[in-house]
Amino acid sequence: MASNIGYDVAGGQFDAMIPGGGVGIFNGCANILGYMRGAQFGGLLSDCENEKGNSGNDEEIYTKRKQCLSKSCNSQFADKYQAKLGCLFLANFLEAAGNPMHTYKEVKCPSVLKDRY
């Protein structure tokens, strides 16, 4: 299990280790099971932002980035089904958002996670 907040994100943001995303300033998960691919900051999403654009609220740019990320997820994790699902979660459910703002609250770590690690 890893916890990562490098204090290089804004208030209301935190780092979540998702296959296809980056590992942030403290890259403790960089080599775990080969799930972290792409740039240290932003992972495959950063690669797509650099390729397709990363500015403005242009719906076309967002669509191109999501398509790029989905394609990268499917190719980079073709043989790692669970990692591919995590990466596609970043692309589809999280709308390929790099550092989105969230409303969240701290909760006690569930025993199912503590028992696993």
What are these regions (language model features)?
Residues 1-117:
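Mature exported/compartmentalized surface modules and terminal targeting/interaction regions
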